[in-house]
A protein has these predicted regions:
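Dinucleotide-binding Rossmann-like beta1-alpha1 core, especially the glycine-rich loop
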Residues: 58-158, 316, 328, 334-337
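Helix-loop-beta segment of a Rossmann-like dinucleotide-binding subdomain
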Residues: 108-121, 158-201, 359-363, 425-432
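Helical element adjacent to the flavin cofactor pocket in flavoenzyme catalytic cores
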Residues: 173-241, 438-452
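C-terminal catalytic lobe of FAD-dependent flavoproteins
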Residues: 171-180, 188, 325-457
Length: 499
């Protein structure tokens, strides 16, 4: 029988057409214009899973308002470290996106980024005290110097009129606001980046193509077996470097790669739902991302928010996310994803993480059992005047939280984003969930540093990275003048007004 397998050779293969692969592809092509890149995506369009606007839990994560990034310590103080690192990373993303706009590599910034204030909102004496402590810990840092805090009823009404409707002046309430917050449509941004990439010499983008097998050859290069889901045609792609950026699909692919660095990793899938507002009058009354505090015992990804989004030019309002449990790793995945991901090398970490996270299990069971009435009740904590007829339930994306081997051999459930790379730098994979997309540029620059060690230190690559990201190799949280200059410049290019 004739072998009809199509064979190809490249320098880089990107698996998954989401924000991470788009970012890595564009940066590598800028650094080395003659680099040959192949991109494989199992769906028929880019950014249809985790990067899509309706699937993305928190767009524009910059740690201005997400309280899970500033945990309260036992002594009542607040640790600002994680919030500072995320805010720093978001500034890097803003610089890179500005570069893309200035160079006409992506169309007008209005397509993917808008000014939307970021607010934190709490009630009850203990939470008000926490928010004030958080404000004091963050506001002295240049990244957060524009943050405002208030407990004044009239002031809060000005900041978030819809949230304050139906409340009494004697309620114990507090909020912070950051006027420079943004809403980012990562689906639109990702598709624009792939549209640009696809037109370049040496870039091939394949939709409806599923990666079935990965094998490292003796010469350290990789052979990837791929099936065209439309025609059934088989392909073999040979490449020097593989990046797996397939969202929830990354873990099964890491397992197929059979590298020692992947041992002990597991994944815990969490599905999501939103309440979406259908009343244009209500949508028009709210212009902010208002984040609350997760209830006691709930995991950090459960932080509720009432969120203004601009999706495909239309203003939208959503509340959530409500979590659920599904054994799928992707919205378009299989119910066998979780059971098939359990292997001998990750069984103990998986069981141990389950045993050590009883509150998470309890929380998910409660969420799954919620009735429409329960969801509206949760919404009314944020919008007391909400009417159930103005809201519908929408399915959001799948998140796969990382489980990794702890020091004692047991499992630790991680709530962040994790990059794993092989020692020889020929394969890298991104696992995990938030902050994800917002910090994609920092994550990919770090990945390039790990996997292209020789090239990244050449004067040529360094100069190009500095051109794309003016603050490259510098921190902004301790350089107020540089931060102000960069924020001003990126706000201008990205058309972020302060209305």
């Amino acid at each position: 029988m004739p072998d009809n397998t199509i064979r190809s050779n490249s320098d880089v293969v990107l698996i998954g057409a989401g924000i991470m692969s788009a970012t890595l592809g564009v940066i590598l092509k800028e650094l080395q214009p003659d680099i040959k890149i192949e991109i494989y995506e199992r769906l028929d369009v880019a950014a249809a899973e985790s990067s899509d606007a309706w699937n993305n839990a928190g767009t524009g994560h910059s740690a201005f308002c997400e309280l899970n990034y500033t945990p309260e310590k036992a002594d009542g103080s607040v640790d600002p470290k994680k919030a500072i690192s995320i805010a720093e990373a978001f500034e890097v993303s803003r610089q890179f996106w500005s570069y893309l706009v200035q160079q006409n590599k992506v169309p007008s910034p209005e397509n993917f980024i808008k000014s939307v204030p970021h607010m934190s909102f709490v009630w009850g004496e203990k939470n008000v005290k926490y928010l004030q402590t958080r404000f004091e810990a963050l506001q002295k840092n240049p990244l957060f110097s524009e943050m405002l805090f208030s407990t004044d009823f009239e002031q809060l009404k000005q900041w978030m009129p819809l949230v304050m409707e139906g409340r009494e002046p004697d309620e114990k309430l507090a909020a912070t606001t950051m006027a420079i917050g943004t809403d980012v449509n990562f689906g639109a941004l990702t598709r624009s980046m792939f549209n640009y990439l696809e037109k370049l010499d040496g870039v091939s983008l394949y939709f409806n193509h599923e990666v079935r097998k990965l094998k490292q050859l003796e010469n350290k290069s990789w052979r990837i077996k791929i099936t065209d889901l439309g025609s059934g045609e088989k392909r073999k792609a040979y490449t020097k470097f593989v990046f797996i950026g397939a969202g929830g699909g990354s873990l099964p692919l890491l397992e197929k790669a059979n590298v020692p660095e992947g041992d002990g990793y597991g994944g815990f899938p969490v599905s999501g739902q939103w309440l979406k507002c259908t009343n244009p009058e209500v949508i028009a009354k709210h212009q902010a991302k208002v984040y609350g505090k997760a209830s006691v015992g709930a995991p950090p990804m459960s932080v509720p928010h009432i969120d203004t989004r601009v999706i495909d030019g239309e203003k939208a309002l959503l509340f959530g996310p409500f979590a659920g449990f599904s054994t799928r790793f992707l919205k378009n995945g299989s119910y066998l994803d979780l059971p098939l991901s359990i292997k001998a090398n990750n069984l103990i970490p998986m069981l141990s993480a389950g045993y050590n996270n009883i509150p998470l299990t309890k929380y998910l069971i409660e969420q799954v059992r919620q009735s429409p009435k329960d969801r509206i009740k949760a919404l009314r904590e944020y919008l007391p005047t909400a009417r159930s007829k103005d809201w519908v339930l929408e399915k959001a994306g799948q998140r796969v939280q990382v489980i990794k081997k702890g020091e004692n051999g047991g499992g630790v459930l991680e709530f962040g984003t994790e990059v794993i790379n092989t020692q020889d730098g020929t394969l890298a994979v991104l696992l995990g969930a938030s902050p994800g997309a917002s910090t994609a540029v920092s994550i990919m620059v770090d990945l390039i540093g790990r996997c292209f060690k020789e090239q990244i230190n050449t004067p040529e690559w360094e100069a190009k990275l500095k051109n794309m990201i003016p603050s490259y190799k510098q921190t902004l949280n301790d350089k107020p003048e540089l931060l102000e200059q960069i924020r001003k410049q990126t706000a201008e290019v990205l058309k972020l007004n302060r209305n």
